[in-house]
Amino acid sequence: MESIEQQLTELRTTLRHHEYLYHVMDAPEIPDAEYDRLMRELRELETKHPELITPDSPTQRVGAAPLAAFSQIRHEVPMLSLDNVFDEESFLAFNKRVQDRLKNNEKVTWCCELKLDGLAVSILYENGVLVSAATRGDGTTGEDITSNVRTIRAIPLKLHGENIPARLEVRGEVFLPQAGFEKINEDARRTGGKVFANPRNAAAGSLRQLDPRITAKRPLTFFCYGVGVLEGGELPDTHLGRLLQFKKWGLPVSDRVTLCESAEEVLAFYHKVEEDRPTLGFDIDGVVIKVNSLAQQEQLGFVARAPRWAVAFKFPAQEQMTFVRDVEFQVGRTGAITPVARLEPVHVAGVLVSNATLHNADEIERLGLRIGDKVVIRRAGDVIPQVVNVVLSERPEDTREVVFPTHCPVCGSDVERVEGEAVARCTGGLICGAQRKESLKHFVSRRAMDVDGMGDKIIDQLVEKEYVHTPADLFKLTAGKLTGLERMGPKSAQNVVNALEKAKETTFARFLYALGIREVGEATAAGLAAYFGTLEALEAASIEELQKVPDVGIVVASHVHNFFAEESNRNVISELLAEGVHWPAPIVINAEEIDSPFAGKTVVLTGSLSQMSRDDAKARLVELGAKVAGSVSKKTDLVIAGEAAGSKLAKAQELGIEVIDEAEMLRLLGS
């Protein structure tokens, strides 16, 4: 007679086998009812013997309790995005760039896949067992969705087969088939629940549930398309070979993956998929085209946040016709005035569209748009609604000219348009309510001053009630004043006050980024902070001095110089410092007096480090007299390459710049 352990092992093995046949091979051998019977038998045995339950059991897909919030997972290898092409000419230009970059006229073959319209995820297996899963997030850090991913039956909790790597990070797309999407919405309408606009939104909403039991009820599925971390094992040296190996281990791969021998075959694949698109049963918005050879991929490298060896060939966006009811003008954080078309609502690609951006005055002139016109609306990339053209043959007689404002629609200040720029801007600065709201929202955001609990709606109310006019006013708020806001009780109000107090202790780089200087993002702010060290030195810097900072050109230097030249901005900064905003004093370093191999050198870090964080490494390098830059140029003296170094390493090699690895960096730091 079999032992309980043997029965459990056999049931789990049988169920995993049938999950593989159903989800990966699309060739089920048993009816659903038989699968359900086996699952019930396993569940009953595990209920009687809970001490024998294993984490990879098919019964353990459903989490037991909701989470309070998602924690973060940092991607060991960044999840990069892809560049897009939208027509054959652009694809052929991409193909030529690839051919030109490869030496010796090497033959290029292409692995072509469907571009699924879902949610990109990363799944980590250790010794074949699923241990974590994360969303793409910002490409560097994503949300921990492990409990939810475990509920998706297409994703194996344990890989099967031989030669499975010790650590394998699989990347792919979670999506919702059309039939499942329609059923979710049908159930929602019947029960008065939330109706989703399209399958992608439904997939994202299902996967980002704090309660995995809800995710388990949604018929999500998954196809894998790539690899991140790979340790303690090997994979084939072609992209297609890797996908086929994934399939052998039990991971689902689309059966539409195709190897193409030429650009002509790629175009034929694209048109065939476009033709079949309505019958696939799930949403796609194009095809993904990748160089098949891993060696060639490595040779081609990366640029910015995308590989040079892959591209997304998007399908033409879906279009509809409707009428322009009116054109209104919105004011953004930097004073940019953007015209927005208010439309007769129309469904485009499954979404009800009632507004579309018109970008600027030049675009209105190019379109020849008048209020009342019949227009063609497109969801560019199936996401952002835009006006494609005016249907002049059906123009009504009572259309009206669109008049671009000469004064800000919010504060009445003059509108100016700098010669050579397409964007018109309000000159009202912080006296403009619209700019004030957006500036304050940026100021408190996570990557800026990081004021926890200070959401957009709170900022809106604070500005509308005239409690806050400048960022410094935020630090004068009391719990009593906040309690008067909508949905803000005494406890929540005190939490916000505490968060503001905590935010006073920041870094020079975060403070600069929070000020919202035009063209100054996080990387530029960090570069300015590292180079000048103190606010006083930065405020006094000339445009010429500012351009000595790595990655700062004449445009950014001018914006920074003009910002600090404006008295109202200096006054706001003084108020912030008076309210207690502060950061650690810089370590004053004279590179000439430091006996260090890094002294006086411009250094760039790339890839992931295993022995210390990037921030710690930067701090140590600066202490030893280095200037740490964000990108590689002819001014770069040294590149430190960690794991999965990408385009920066390739550029350094191209320019003949010295490159060292993490081990050598640590040795030099120790010396």
Swiss-Prot record:
Active site annotation, chain numbering: 115
Effect on the protein of changing residue 22 to F: Reduces nick joining activity by 91%
Effect annotated for changing residue 143 to A: Reduces nick joining activity by 48%
Effect of residue 379 to A/Q: Reduces nick joining activity by over 95%
Binding annotation for NAD(+): 32-36, 81-82, 113, 136, 173, 290, 314
Phenotype upon changing residue 200 to A/K/Q: Reduces nick joining activity by 99.9%
Positions marked as site (Interaction with target DNA): 487, 492
Effect in UniProt of substituting residue 23 to A/Y: Reduces nick joining activity by 90%
EC class (word): ligase
A Gene Ontology cellular-component term: cytosol
Effect of residue 35 to F: Reduces nick joining activity by 77%
Known outcome of mutating residue 208 to A/K/Q: Reduces nick joining activity by 99%
Region of interest (Interaction with target DNA), residue spans: 330-334, 453-458, 519-524, 551-556
Name used for this protein in its record: DNA ligase
